[in-house]
């Protein structure tokens, strides 16, 4: 079993991010402060989501718990594919779980269509967000004590949809105001 601290994961993501941005800047021979700030928002979304998805929410000895990489004995115990089956009765605090899973992904629905031109419709933004959350859910199969749940996929994608609706409604309102 391998244990990873939040700081180690944060450092790894940061190094990958910086290297990627440098390579892209060198290849394109261009640098835009505005674009880098936009992409920094994407980075912040990823890091915050990694914090709450990969690491237990409660502290252990005043520290964020480590992420344990490995496999459970029976993978079937780690996967729920029945919508809303465990949502309410799995644990106390299920209301907070619903709110947190939705709220955590609202920024993705807001930031991604602003940063990525190809996400020019609500549908494309929601599909990209659903793909992102699916990757997160599948990745959790490699972590001890974590599980993959279709409820999380539904709730996270709902958060993306709410964020996307906010952005696209603002854009529609701006177009109407500019045409007056």
Regions found by a protein language model. Give the residues of each.
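Bulky hydrophobic segments
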Residues: 1-145, 150, 164-180
